[in-house]
Amino acid sequence: DNISLKIDNSKLVAITGPNGSGKSTLAKIIMGILKPDSGSIFFDGKDITNIGITDRAKLGIGFAFQQPVKFKGLTVRDLIELSSGNTINVSEACNYLSDVGLCAKDYLNREVSNSLSGGELKRIEIAMLAAKKSKLTVFDEPEAGIDLWSFNSLISVFEKMHSEISDSSIVIISHQEKILNIADEIILLVDGKVQAVGQKE
């Protein structure tokens, strides 16, 4: 609804607001799942308004869904390697899984299927995005479906991604205070409009 936003490089931005305020819709517009009714979206100086999700991913935009996608026939290691775009060794793959609170040896060769819980899939997806090192990574309510201990470990993952990946940005859709606390900038959405932009203070 006439939203105008700029996400700067090297920033961790939290988008928050009450239920139904348009947070997830905005995330899907950024990723290319939905198209805006009007206006334009620019990424690295390029108009990507009419570019779909696959081509946006190729440009360097990563997205973690509220309900992670299953990849039958692929193992967890396969997915992490595909995401990274490089051949990675077992130790590297294990590190990405350990960072999100999963015991790597129990998961590395498991198929990404219905045998995994929603919380496990969520953490695997976040490990994939950490391996991908996108220019812009969007997390849509990453806390959904995971326990408190796992959520605390995710905070550390976001901080690590933020500190290690230069010239890139992270956008997290969330109302969790711990996420707002680590954000460089907070965008408050209310009824589909930007109500405020600034730091938590």
For every predicted segment, state its role.
Residues Q67, G73-N89:
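Q-loop/switch helix immediately C-terminal to the Walker
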Residues T16-P18:
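The feature captures the beta-strand-to-loop junction immediately N-terminal to the Walker
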Residues D47-G62:
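ABC ATPase NBD coupling module
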Residues V138-P142, W149:
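Walker B catalytic motif
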Residues L129-A130:
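ABC ATPase C-loop
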